[in-house]
A protein has these predicted regions:
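Conserved AdoMet/S-adenosylmethionine-binding subsite of the radical SAM
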Residues: 124-139, 150-220
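Short glycine-rich or small-residue beta-strand-to-loop segments that form or flank ligand, phosphate
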Residues: 95, 143-145
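Glycine-rich, often proline-containing surface loops adjacent to acidic residues and nearby aromatics
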Residues: 103, 137-143
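Short strand->helix junction
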Residues: 114, 149-150
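Catalytic micro-motifs at enzyme active sites that drive phosphoryl/nucleotidyl and oxygen chemistry
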Residues: 80-83, 93-95, 128-129
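Flexible, acidic/Gly-rich N-terminal and inter-domain linker regions that tether
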Residues: 1-86
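Conserved short loop/turn motifs at secondary-structure junctions
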Residues: 10-11, 145-149
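Canonical Radical SAM [4Fe-4S] cluster-binding loop centered on the CxxxCxxC motif
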Residues: 86-120, 175
Length: 220
């Protein structure tokens, strides 16, 4: 079940999740407004996704902390690794960073604290953890998400290579990103190089609305 944090009445203050919109999304919003109008379904579809609404500042009775409390607990004598969640025996969610190119309104990642980005050493340790018993006995797939992992493609190479070396039990690596729909220019040779000679790597585009599937996004 979803984890719901009940706040004392005095603490029912809204979370400040700042508006963050890429220049490319700003241009797209302007184009849709000029072409269809500010209150049109075409413009609102994108604006509701990224433009901060004043109602977000109103107090609320409860807040959803996460979809599920699935963070991995480590023994007291071990140093815990950030960004690991496990929902099922055969799969694991890895969040190498909580940074994104743009902030989707009402994203539950806003409630994840503290914010972090894994170091190269931590990425290698994550791969070793996934490749060691008893975790490796059932783990066959990982989902790399965030945040958005493609905000740092140069760092992901370290994580992918670590899995190849230390976690051969992981047969599928899924990479979830909104970068193609938020800032398609970032899908350059540095990003594409991640997929070279990695047949077990799958890319998944996270989107809910057709307005984000622009020609540039589809090309990316």
């Amino acid at each position: 079940a979803a984890a719901v944090v009940k706040l004392p009445l005095s603490d029912k203050k809204p979370l400040v999740f700042k508006e963050l919109i890429t220049p490319w999304l700003h241009r797209k919003l302007d184009e849709l407004e000029q072409r269809y109008g500010k209150d049109s379904p075409e413009h609102r579809a994108l604006a509701l996704q990224y433009v901060k609404d004043g109602r977000e500042d109103e107090p609320m009775d409860e807040r959803n902390a996460k979809h599920y409390e699935a963070g991995i607990s480590f023994p007291e004598n071990e140093t815990g690794l950030p960004g690991l969640e496990r929902f099922y025996r055969r799969s694991m969610v890895i969040e190498p960073t909580l940074s994104c190119a743009a902030h989707c309104r009402y994203c539950l990642r806003a409630y994840y604290a503290p914010k972090f980005t894994m170091s190269d050493h931590q990425m290698v340790q994550v791969a070793k953890y996934c490749g060691s018993p008893p975790v490796s006995d059932h783990l066959r797939e990982v989902l790399i998400t965030g945040g958005d992992p493609l905000v740092m493609p140069h760092r992901l190479e370290t994580l992918f290579n670590a899995f190849i070396e230390h976690a051969p039990n992981v047969r599928t690596i899924r990479l979830a990103s909104r970068i193609p729909t938020q800032d398609p220019g970032r899908i350059d040779q540095n990003a594409l190089r991640l997929f070279h000679n990695k047949p077990s790597l799958r890319f998944e585009l996270a989107t809910q609305i057709n307005a984000t599937l622009t020609p540039l996004a589809q090309a990316a």
